[in-house]
Amino acid sequence: MEQRPRGCAAVAAALLLVLLGARAQGGTRSPRCDCAGDFHKKIGLFCCRGCPAGHYLKAPCTEPCGNSTCLVCPQDTFLAWENHHNSECARCQACDEQASQVALENCSAVADTRCGCKPGWFVECQVSQCVSSSPFYCQPCLDCGALHRHTRLLCSRRDTDCGTCLPGFYEHGDGCVSCPTSTLGSCPERCAAVCGWRQMFWVQVLLAGLVVPLLLGATLTYTYRHCWPHKPLVTADEAGMEALTPPPATHLSPLDSAHTLLAPPDSSEKICTVQLVGNSWTPGYPETQEALCPQVTWSWDQLPSRALGPAAAPTLSPESPAGSPAMMLQPGPQLYDVMDAVPARRWKEFVRTLGLREAEIEAVEVEIGRFRDQQYEMLKRWRQQQPAGLGAVYAALERMGLDGCVEDLRSRLQRGP
């Protein structure tokens, strides 16, 4: 009877130990790994931790939630995101030097090279729908100071926006012209602070220069009439007798003999006989004159050139007229000389400056494949639309700042074919 309670106690103790052990085993949870998380991805049979940015996957993990074998990207390669499957890195891009691109940020293991334009240049997309990855080339920013204008908007993503003219300059046509320094001409309204006061000053000086001589002359005339002794008066009879008295005869030397001023055959002027008296030429007496001549006395150095001989033939200007064939752009070799003198990258800007319509440029690009044939066709169409003078070509190149190309083209045209 005493052994049953002991056996029951032993069984109860065993059951208690089993329950405690099962409870303890249920309280210890096995580690879990969720493949749907951001940092764990399932590679094969296991959920592995991925490689960080700038590393590529060398080998996956060998246990659940284990670390994969990752290596750093080699030089000139990168991976900008966390990697779970990539076994190699992407190659870094190179900036296009032909398009004037520069590296704003060099390539690293976690970022690609960032290409852009250097200071003073702006990005010009080569496609109409421009995005960050679109091809582009760099253009120099417009220098508003060189154009004598204020800078309204600095050059960054687009060209510089220039404003009004700087002080000391005024609008004239499409540009800014320096205010005149001469005080005799007109002074534009915007230049009043520069030349307005000078003009008024010199107007006053000119008025003073006119008034002072008048006052001085009036003073001298008054003094002469009131202070100088008067000449004796001559009666009308005495004056008539003096007028009827012939002058004494004088003997003229051979140099004082009469000479005839000869006019050119095609001249409508009258022939006039004059006499050289002393060192001067005077018109001859009425009986020796073939036509009425004004009473003019000429010294030897003032004698008209046609009296001494035929006039010298006028010298002809060596320059050709503006509309002559020599100043017109001829088809054939001259067109190729223009094509060779203009840089290819600025060709479309050149033909736009000449005045070729944008529709014509686009039509040539669609119809003709080769670039050189496109250049020739654009020049040919421009010649057909308006007078194609070499002066227009030189002026367009100078407006584009290609003075060296102007000299090159002139030398090409002088050498000829």
Swiss-Prot record:
One Gene Ontology term, aspect cellular component: extracellular region
Annotated Death domain residues: 332-413
Effect after changing L356A: Suppresses homodimerization, and TNFR1 interaction
UniProt keyword Nucleotidyltransferase, yes or no: no
Glycosylation sites: N67, N106, R352
Family annotation (InterPro entries): DEATH-like_dom_sf (IPR011029), Death_dom (IPR000488), TNFR/NGFR_Cys_rich_reg (IPR001368), TNFR_25 (IPR022329), TNFRSF25_N (IPR034050)
Post-translational modification remark: (Microbial infection) Glycosylated at Arg-352 by enteropathogenic E.coli protein NleB1.
Membrane side Cytoplasmic: residue ranges: 221-417
Key words, A-Z: Apoptosis, Cell membrane, Disulfide bond, Glycoprotein, Membrane, Receptor, Repeat, Secreted, Signal, Transmembrane, Transmembrane helix
Gene Ontology BP, a term: cell surface receptor signaling pathway
Stretches in topological domain Extracellular: 25-199
Keyword Methyltransferase in record: no
Subunit structure: Homodimer. Interacts strongly via the death domains with TNFRSF1 and TRADD to activate at least two distinct signaling cascades, apoptosis and NF-kappa-B signaling. Interacts with BAG4.
Function according to Swiss-Prot or TrEMBL: Receptor for TNFSF12/APO3L/TWEAK. Interacts directly with the adapter TRADD. Mediates activation of NF-kappa-B and induces apoptosis. May play a role in regulating lymphocyte homeostasis.
Record's protein name: Tumor necrosis factor receptor superfamily member 25
UniProt source species: Homo sapiens (Human)
Species lineage: Eukaryota, Metazoa, Chordata, Craniata, Vertebrata
